[in-house]
Amino acid sequence: MDEIINKYQAVEKLFKEIQEGLAMYDQYKTLINELLHYNNHIKQEYFNFLMIISPYLIRAHSGETLRNKVNNEIKRLILVENINTKISKTLVSVNFLLQKKLSTDGVKTKNMWCTNNPMLQVKTAHNLFKQLCDTQSKTQWVQTLKYKECKYCHTDMVFNTTQFGLQCPNCGCIQELMGTIFDETHFYNHDGQKAKSGIFNPNRHYRFWIEHILGRNSEQELGTKQDPCGTKVLQQLKKIIKRDNKCIALLTVENIRKMLKEINRTDLNNCVSLILRKLTGVGPPQISESILLRGEYIFTEAIKIREKVCKKGRINRNYYPYYIYKIFDAILPPNDTTNRRILQYIHLQGNDTLANNDSEWESICMELPEIKWKPTDRTHCVHFF
């Protein structure tokens, strides 16, 4: 227990040091806000941990025999609540943010994807923080020019397209912007064109599909107004399994999709992993946060490349589970049979579509050094049942 408390205190000290060290630099405000989210999260986890063990600590003063029993119970709670993994998960995210910031500043860092020791991760985060400070100290001579601020009344100026520059709303002072092209066509939609509602975010698609592939989505997604918990759907599926004499332990993604089609509930195709877990009692492998973050990075890069190299004549929308399948097939070692079970929870499309996807993926891999291209083998996941 003392070891866990020491880990939480080490993380708290780390966050405080980073926040105080970077607060003086304007360019790190966004980074500090992102880290603040993880700081609040780890504080809440620490509070919850203390709430769980506090009743046992009170009982520990009742005698040596009971004290030993209480200590064993606390150790069991630490394992059940997966405390070390929760701390490690937060630190992996923090290190990822610090590495990302350093890479944008042009500083090369060593990736720590597979480190699962919280205290080592604290040390890694501290070293990354020191690199950020060292990078900033080397560039202190660089000054930020507030070009939007009026030099007479110090208020923010606004763009004036007719004067080709910035104009102060108070004194009317105009500051010409050299080398800037003003074109009114940028300020309204062209005829026949539709304005975009937002910026495309590949990370959002990745997290959505990973959540569903790993069966981490809410069980409420199986329900309806009449059946909030999805009990009726599961009962219907069990009847089909019994009718067809299927072995529950050998059910596959394709089996569930066919049964959902039979009961007219193809709207639940995204929830197949969750349904498999509910029916069989065995869920997808719980991939570590470091591997998931690495997968997210490669996925984002792959989608960016795809937008550049995709065939103009192709109308099919992106099928994101295919990309996730190819990424994890590439980054998970062949002997890691536990984690590679994730492949059997990903539905692959028909042969013609799969061939087109493989051809497109080959073009993506040419510009994606992290992945070596190979054709998709549908029978590959059979080895992991």
Swiss-Prot record:
Pfam families: A2L_zn_ribbon (PF08792), Pox_VLTF3 (PF04947). It comes from the Viruses. Keywords: Late protein, Metal-binding, Zinc, Zinc-finger. A zinc finger (C2H2-type) spans 166-190, 168-190. Disulfide bonds: none annotated. Induction: Expressed in the late phase of the viral replicative cycle. InterPro entries: Poxvirus_VLTF3, VLTF-3_Zn_ribbon. The keyword Metal-binding applies. GO terms for biological process: regulation of viral transcription. GO terms for molecular function: zinc ion binding. Belongs to the asfivirus B385R family. This is Zinc finger protein B385R.
